[in-house]
Design a protein with these regions (language model features):
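PLP-dependent amino-acid enzyme catalytic core
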Residues: 1-321
Length: 321
């Protein structure tokens, strides 16, 4: 296909897959000698994050089963979210003509709450962890479940924390993209832990192609304020996470999520968000111990949604220079 002549019937045709992958970019200035680290730029997806993939997969499943669409007129989507999945679902809901209600933790950055409303979501803010705990009946998950149960004619909850299509999205798209883009040479994959759909899907696909591929999860230290990701100690009730599919879990001081994100911007020209800073630091430490021939890092989203958090954590930044 001649992509230079391609046009699109609507924005969802820009969603990534093996024929239309998100970019894979080599880092050059910050990588230890003898290693190659590549960033998969998920903020280039149409709604701005890796969560576009799972959101689309979950909505399409609901439509196929008649839970959304002409068979259920007026029914919309309700979902607990720390921001990115909610943004993706809200944008897709707008394109498909569905209402959207997002249950959002109070500590989520203001930028994300505003963007959800810009895209048309009704936002209900609840005291909760930055990344809601899977299986919880309280906080944002409890609120979303209450709406879905009490008003089932109005709302359906995809439930990214337990939905197998969250994993399947990465088996179907992200994994095959990486395999094809690296010509099957990928040796390491680095990603974070949130709902765990990304890490589980990547592991299932890539280890199916080559069991020697190392899948490394990078987590923030406890007490962190990095939205959308979690420490593995919080995953005891996760319905998607299988520790047998992860080769190693690296813990990084959460403050580095922000300072390393700034480092990536200043030396590699990448507008990487704090979770990407954390992932890169984990990959860099791995490469310092032993060469990483072909390491792929999932850079989940960009820094713009975290400007207020960057201001708090990166020394020398000023809102009014």
């Amino acid at each position: 296909m001649d992509h230079s002549a391609r046009v699109y019937d609507d924005i969802t045709e820009l969603l990534p897959d093996e024929e239309n992958p998100s970019p894979l970019v080599r880092l050059n200035r910050l990588v230890p000698e003898g290693s190659q680290l590549w960033a998969k730029l998920e903020w280039m997806n149409p709604f701005g994050s890796v969560k576009d993939r799972a959101a689309w997969e979950m909505v399409r499943d609901l439509e196929r089963r008649g839970e959304l669409g002409p068979a259920r007129p007026g029914r919309g989507i309700v979902e607990p979210t720390s921001g990115n999945t909610g943004l993706s679902l809200t944008a897709i809901a707008g394109v498909r003509g569905y209402p959207m209600l997002a249950a959002v933790p109070s500590k989520v950055p203001a930028e994300k709450k505003v963007l959800l409303q810009v895209f048309g979501a009704k936002v209900e803010v609840v005291p909760d962890a930055l990344c809601p705990l899977p299986g919880s009946e309280d906080g944002t998950i409890g609120l979303a479940k209450t709406h879905a149960k009490a008003s089932a004619h109005r709302w359906v909850m995809p439930n990214q924390y337990a939905n197998p299509h969250n994993v399947e999205a990465h088996v179907r798209t992200t994994g095959p993209e990486i395999w094809r883009q690296t010509r099957g040479q990928v040796t390491h994959v680095f990603t974070s832990l949130g709902t765990c759909g990304t890490v589980m899907g990547l592991s299932k696909f890539l280890k199916g192609k080559n069991p020697a591929v190392k899948v490394i999860a990078v987590q923030p230290s406890p007490g962190h304020d990095v939205p959308g990701i979690r420490n593995v100690s919080e995953l005891d009730v996760s319905q998607l996470y299988d520790p047998k599919l992860v080769d190693e879990v690296l813990e990084i001081d959460f403050e580095l999520a922000y300072t390393v994100a700034a480092e990536l911007a200043r030396h590699e020209g990448l507008r990487a968000g704090p979770s990407s800073g954390l992932i890169f630091e984990g990959a860099r430490r791995t490469a310092r111990k032993a060469p990483v021939p072909c390491g792929v890092m999932i850079f989940c989203d960009d820094v713009f949604k975290y400007a207020s958090n960057m201001l708090k954590h990166v020394p020398g930044l000023q809102a009014e220079p």
